């Protein structure tokens, strides 16, 4: 799911620390985790910002939440890194993302499935025969783009089993419509309440804490940024709040190149009280 925001809609306070707490908070019903804006990137130009993003995703234990947004037959979250997920509405760009879709059922069965997606195309699942993933596994995910964001590649490596899946493709395009390059205005490290192909939105499981290790994003000259090392105008921290239940479901932290996204169920009257 692509996340479109305007700076004026952001909530939060800033401080001098470079741990992500200096970023404005942005509340929605889908994303949890940090967004890092590329330095000196101009959205109206054809310049390229980040051309690589990576992190190692640690597969958390999943359980049925005590107070979910609603009760369902399957609780799911997508756990991913991306390029170009935060855009203004007048720019034709496509989110290039890869990671793991995590699900748990009431009988305790769990499933961890690798995926990649270039929005607006549908996600492509990675079968377990190509990349088996289990609780506790460390999945190193790398996204790259070339040709000014019109071509991309990804690798997902299970560091516990040494199995690697690779994929490359051109940018998504609509039939007789525009092409959606990922020119790297932003990089993201996110746990998301995404949507199934029938457009029904996921309901989060309880994942405790989902960790991204060795997270960074780099431009084509090799200059790299960490998720939380920007100033207050170079990033934002997203969090999931549902107004109908008056509940905040996530809280995120950054320490160096490590991102931690915690599942919580905190009742509060509004996001102003977060």
Regions found by a protein language model. Give the residues of each.
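Fungal secretory targeting signals
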Residues: 1-19
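Exposed, interaction-prone regions of secreted/extracellular proteins
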Residues: 15-274
């Amino acid at each position: 799911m692509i996340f479109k925001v305007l700076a004026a809609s952001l909530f939060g306070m800033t401080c001098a620390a470079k741990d992500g707490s200096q970023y404005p908070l942005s509340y929605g019903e889908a994303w949890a985790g940090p967004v890092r804006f590329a330095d000196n990137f101009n959205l109206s130009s054809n310049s390229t910002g980040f051309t690589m993003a990576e992190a190692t995703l640690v597969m958390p234990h999943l359980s049925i939440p005590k107070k979910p947004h609603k009760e369902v037959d399957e609780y799911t979250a997508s756990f991913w890194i991306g390029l170009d997920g935060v855009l203004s509405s007048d720019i034709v760009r496509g989110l290039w993302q890869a990671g793991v879709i995590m699900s748990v059922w009431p009988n305790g069965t769990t499933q961890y499935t690798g995926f990649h997606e270039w929005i607006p195309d549908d996600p492509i699942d990675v079968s377990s025969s190509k990349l088996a993933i289990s609780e506790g596994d460390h999945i190193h995910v790398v996204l790259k783009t070339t040709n000014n964001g019109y071509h991309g590649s990804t690798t997902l490596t299970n560091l516990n089993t040494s199995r690697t899946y690779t994929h490359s493709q051109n940018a998504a395009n609509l039939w007789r419509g525009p092409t959606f390059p990922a020119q790297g205005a932003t990089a993201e490290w996110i746990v998301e309440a995404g949507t199934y192909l029938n457009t029904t939105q996921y309901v989060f499981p309880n994942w405790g804490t989902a960790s991204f290790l060795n997270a960074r994003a780099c431009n084509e000259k090799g200059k790299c940024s960490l998720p939380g090392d920007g100033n207050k105008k170079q990033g934002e921290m997203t969090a999931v709040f549902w107004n109908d239940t008056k509940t905040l479901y996530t809280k995120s932290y950054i320490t160096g190149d490590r991102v931690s996204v915690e599942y919580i169920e905190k009742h509060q009257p509004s996001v102003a009280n977060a």
